[in-house]
């Protein structure tokens, strides 16, 4: 479809906004293989961006990354959320710090830029968890120009009826506002503390922040 539309309308860049492009690795491999083959001979090469799941090298291989680059991928956004495995496990993100390191390394090796989507001030985030996020930013500074944007937002808001609010209804006090919640098991993580952490993270990552 992308090839057909590009040839018909002269549009060569596409953005995916409603799903994770590598949710099914079989479908993803078919996708990048076809685009890589097309781009190898096309006068006007296709490029694309979208949201992608962070996967380690066993799940998303070196060959997958090579084809990803040849398919025209760039500025892929991934929900990294936190530098702490413990926090991500609570979110059910299902990838380790090693997976993340491999993901970032392969993206850099193949010249595919990334965007990090972050959540600062998740209810279970301790001081040490937050420090792990800061250490993650420091760790990736060696990859020059790899991470084009880090989206920090303000701080985590919790809405009534969402899974987070429902699953922790007895420990999470919403206090009539999505930003003013208090988690009884982590009471020092106040709204003021969460905002402070967001500011510190923005100063530490050294990248563009929104």
Predicted regions, residues:
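Short, solvent-exposed turn/loop segments enriched in Gly/Ser/Thr/Pro and often Arg
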Residues: 17-23, 53, 120-124, 151-164
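C-terminal accessory regions of radical SAM enzymes
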Residues: 128-210
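Active-site glycine- and acidic-residue-rich loops that bind
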Residues: 56-59, 124-133
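Conserved SAM/AdoMet-binding glycine-rich loop
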Residues: 1-115, 120
